[in-house]
């Protein structure tokens, strides 16, 4: 196991080079950057790695629709993300791309190692094939029905229902996404990773995994069920070639996380450091990811690393999801805030957004982004508390003590309070509690404001100049501490604040320096307003941009995809009934599924993928429409004997119900 003296490698889930950055992306990258900056302020040896995810069917489909090559599309968005990260002060030590030669090489090396150790085997399977396009349909090239929960799904994932990863050939009623033709099924040989053989290893490993409990518990729920072997090849030309085959590439979720290793190699090569220090030694590897890719990082990835003989991640830190104005995040419905167009290009301070994302709520909980809440947090917490105290303290010292730190004793109570704040911030960040850490800095600012007000230096200066000097030296000591502790959250603004104390650079400053006495007679810089208020007119303008996007999305709508005509007798075979929900509860380990007991003339247990739209308590007593004669299926280990009918509004489920209450079990015709 790694110790406190071992090197630390921090990675972020790779941004997919298929579209622009939105603030949901930053929910992963900003906290990771804060964490890395804090580690360095605590004296740790840390390397910060990321890069663009360049492969997979969505990129190929998007590139084809634009009349460009996948590589051209990837290069465009790779640069876009580099620019956004630079602007938002996320500073990776290395930002690579999974289509770089080094990642092709490392991926093939790992796959060969897995094959040599007997963890990969060939198997003939049936795959969706489009007779019109004359090609096999991997992943996002095909849509159909999830075989586990019966809702519409993508070829590789049941994104609207049970959340399962779908293996090639599993999806039912497959349709080509390109031309809409019903797919045929044809046999072909593919390669599988023996994931099932790693079940006991994963159960033990996940019990020890650090990071957020949400990631660990979610993965454990999956592993406790049956683990199926994992198809790791696809019929595509874009990607990393599978060793020994010209027709197959490795699945994107094989080569994407291997990017963490190849990017580390590239940085190490440039700095004369052996890459094995991080991936074959006693290092601490910490993955920051979005909550939607826990399955891949906590199950597939550690099993591959164990199978190939690499160092395992010690922590997986999964963020909560994002809402926009209390609405579910949705690009198609317009509920999105683009980092460049909607924030940076509007002239807003990057550090404000960093502070918002870190301080709004606990890292694992859902963040609601709103321009009004941003305004309130900036104007109240940053301008009113933090900035107000800093400006008053520095301005008073400059005006009344010749622009220098006055002479005077440092109050033991003040120093104790600073020391407590350093401890609170450090421990909170090491536990990935970013809000708790930022709250600790704001608490010190509140204490400092109270100290300044209660000691009334503006009166004291007239009667006891030395006593007033002592008050101001203590205030400036607290300013110093606040800047050092807030730097990981707002690096640009704190660099400006640091110069107001007459200091040059924060680069080599440690958290422990917050309690080092500020020297008497030290020349101060020029006081300036650190934070500017966000005015009502700005909020109004930004909200109008957002509302216009929603209006355009609603006006455009999505064309309804017509399905093949079916015989009336096929429709008559459905047993549709009105049911009344008697019980509802969340299914442990899933953020999408609810377990319901529904009265349909008899009590039925039904699993429904509606947890993101409905709270369990809202459903009890509600009438619903049920398909009652479906074969029972197990979803997330829970038997489901029926399915609720719902409208699909851009991915949101809206339950159907009769326009007036009818007896439970009433048939529908």
Curated annotation (Swiss-Prot):
<keyword id="KW-0694">RNA-binding</keyword>
<dbReference type="GO" id="GO:0000049">
    <property type="term" value="F:tRNA binding"/>
</dbReference>
<keyword id="KW-0547">Nucleotide-binding</keyword>
<feature type="domain" description="tRNA-binding">
    <location>
        <begin position="570"/>
        <end position="669"/>
    </location>
</feature>
<dbReference type="InterPro" id="IPR023458">
    <property type="entry name" value="Met-tRNA_ligase_1"/>
</dbReference>
<feature type="binding site">
    <location>
        <position position="146"/>
    </location>
    <ligand>
        <name>Zn(2+)</name>
    </ligand>
</feature>
<dbReference type="InterPro" id="IPR012340">
    <property type="entry name" value="NA-bd_OB-fold"/>
</dbReference>
<keyword id="KW-0479">Metal-binding</keyword>
<dbReference type="GO" id="GO:0004825">
    <property type="term" value="F:methionine-tRNA ligase activity"/>
</dbReference>
<keyword id="KW-0030">Aminoacyl-tRNA synthetase</keyword>
<keyword id="KW-0436">Ligase</keyword>
<feature type="short sequence motif" description="'KMSKS' region">
    <location>
        <begin position="328"/>
        <end position="332"/>
    </location>
</feature>
<keyword id="KW-0820">tRNA-binding</keyword>
<comment type="subunit">
    <text>Homodimer.</text>
</comment>
<dbReference type="Pfam" id="PF19303">
    <property type="entry name" value="Anticodon_3"/>
</dbReference>
<dbReference type="InterPro" id="IPR041872">
    <property type="entry name" value="Anticodon_Met"/>
</dbReference>
<dbReference type="GO" id="GO:0005524">
    <property type="term" value="F:ATP binding"/>
</dbReference>
<dbReference type="GO" id="GO:0006431">
    <property type="term" value="P:methionyl-tRNA aminoacylation"/>
</dbReference>
<feature type="binding site">
    <location>
        <position position="149"/>
    </location>
    <ligand>
        <name>Zn(2+)</name>
    </ligand>
</feature>
<keyword id="KW-0963">Cytoplasm</keyword>
<dbReference type="GO" id="GO:0046872">
    <property type="term" value="F:metal ion binding"/>
</dbReference>
<dbReference type="GO" id="GO:0005829">
    <property type="term" value="C:cytosol"/>
</dbReference>
<dbReference type="Pfam" id="PF01588">
    <property type="entry name" value="tRNA_bind"/>
</dbReference>
<feature type="short sequence motif" description="'HIGH' region">
    <location>
        <begin position="15"/>
        <end position="25"/>
    </location>
</feature>
<dbReference type="InterPro" id="IPR004495">
    <property type="entry name" value="Met-tRNA-synth_bsu_C"/>
</dbReference>
<comment type="similarity">
    <text>Belongs to the class-I aminoacyl-tRNA synthetase family. MetG type 1 subfamily.</text>
</comment>
<comment type="function">
    <text>Is required not only for elongation of protein synthesis but also for the initiation of all mRNA translation through initiator tRNA(fMet) aminoacylation.</text>
</comment>
<dbReference type="InterPro" id="IPR009080">
    <property type="entry name" value="tRNAsynth_Ia_anticodon-bd"/>
</dbReference>
<dbReference type="InterPro" id="IPR033911">
    <property type="entry name" value="MetRS_core"/>
</dbReference>
<protein>
    <recommendedName>
        <fullName>Methionine--tRNA ligase</fullName>
        <ecNumber>6.1.1.10</ecNumber>
    </recommendedName>
</protein>
<keyword id="KW-0648">Protein biosynthesis</keyword>
<dbReference type="InterPro" id="IPR002547">
    <property type="entry name" value="tRNA-bd_dom"/>
</dbReference>
<dbReference type="InterPro" id="IPR015413">
    <property type="entry name" value="Methionyl/Leucyl_tRNA_Synth"/>
</dbReference>
<keyword id="KW-0862">Zinc</keyword>
<dbReference type="InterPro" id="IPR014729">
    <property type="entry name" value="Rossmann-like_a/b/a_fold"/>
</dbReference>
<dbReference type="Pfam" id="PF09334">
    <property type="entry name" value="tRNA-synt_1g"/>
</dbReference>
<keyword id="KW-0067">ATP-binding</keyword>
<feature type="binding site">
    <location>
        <position position="162"/>
    </location>
    <ligand>
        <name>Zn(2+)</name>
    </ligand>
</feature>
<dbReference type="InterPro" id="IPR014758">
    <property type="entry name" value="Met-tRNA_synth"/>
</dbReference>
<feature type="binding site">
    <location>
        <position position="158"/>
    </location>
    <ligand>
        <name>Zn(2+)</name>
    </ligand>
</feature>
<dbReference type="GO" id="GO:0017101">
    <property type="term" value="C:aminoacyl-tRNA synthetase multienzyme complex"/>
</dbReference>
<feature type="binding site">
    <location>
        <position position="331"/>
    </location>
    <ligand>
        <name>ATP</name>
    </ligand>
</feature>
